[in-house]
Amino acid sequence: MSTSPLSPVASSRADAALVLFSGGQDSSVCLAWALERYARVETVGFDYGQRHHIEMEARVAVRHQVAERFPHWARRLGEDHVLDLTGFGAVAHSALTADVAIEMTERGLPSTFVPGRNLVFLIYAAALADRRGLGALVGGMCETDFSGYPDCRRDTLDAMQSALNLGMDRDFVIETPLMKLTKAQTWALAKSLGGEDLVDLIVVESHTCYQGERGDLHPWGHGCGECPACELRRRGYEEWDAAGREALGA
């Protein structure tokens, strides 16, 4: 966790947000989205023993570049927090936490599904937000171009929002700006938020690949090019590029 003091705050502020920030494409776009809308934005990352642990380095690079390239956002960008959830990773069996093949399971879900991951992340994020006085929890969950993960559905997150607010006597809002967007539209949203400069930042600095590959830089970013995460990212980028690289809503 960050070494900055985590002073208790009396009430959560509606103009302050906590972004669940992995350092991937989706959470990087969500960070930019939050910085456009909130007066103060903090970030939280989770170390749960993921095979693609390199994303923890990518998130530092993305934050640094956002502050460097977008001074108006830098003034709003607050503390970064990293929470150790390796105990959870040891319990939740998945291709992202163990050396097993990436394939479909008997449940009809990809082996990359980490049972309960987003639910656990949101509980910890809410506890941190409560202490830091942050009223919005922003996540990159999406139910269009996604891998069938049940904890990425909006009805799951609505239920989680209700549970958090009942259990903590707060009024948190879980914001999911990518929920109804395709991956191509996510690239378009990035351009609408920060132009080609933000698109370039996400291509070069963010990390999506489940295999943790950071070797070759493809037009859509770093990655093995074969895992489901790379395939979604590549296909979305190519679709957006072929359509003229327009900003969302243009």
Curated annotation (Swiss-Prot):
Record-annotated residues binding Zn(2+)? Answer: 209, 224, 227, 230
Which cofactors does the annotated protein need, by name? Zn(2+)
Q: Which InterPro entries match?
A: QueC (IPR018317), Rossmann-like_a/b/a_fold (IPR014729)
- Please share the entry's free-text remark on the cofactor: Binds 1 zinc ion per subunit.
Asked if the Swiss-Prot or TrEMBL record annotates the protein with the keyword Ribonucleoprotein, the reply is: no
Leading EC class: ligase
Q: In which pathway does it act?
A: Purine metabolism; 7-cyano-7-deazaguanine biosynthesis
User: Which Pfam families does the entry mention?
Assistant: QueC
Give the coiled coil ranges. none
Q: Name one GO molecular function term.
A: zinc ion binding
Q: Does the keyword Calcium apply?
A: no
- Where are the disulfide bridges? none
Task: Enumerate the residues binding ATP.
Answer: 21-31
Catalyses which reaction? 7-carboxy-7-deazaguanine + NH4(+) + ATP = 7-cyano-7-deazaguanine + ADP + phosphate + H2O + H(+)
Q: Can you cite a GO biological process for this protein?
A: queuosine biosynthetic process
**EC number(s)?**
6.3.4.20
Keywords linked to the UniProt accession: ATP-binding, Ligase, Metal-binding, Nucleotide-binding, Queuosine biosynthesis, Zinc
- Matching NCBIfam families: 7-cyano-7-deazaguanine synthase QueC
What does it do?
Catalyzes the ATP-dependent conversion of 7-carboxy-7-deazaguanine (CDG) to 7-cyano-7-deazaguanine (preQ(0)).
Say which family it is in.
Belongs to the QueC family.
Name by which UniProt lists this protein: 7-cyano-7-deazaguanine synthase
Q: Which organism is it from?
A: Caulobacter sp. (strain K31)
**Annotated gene:** queC
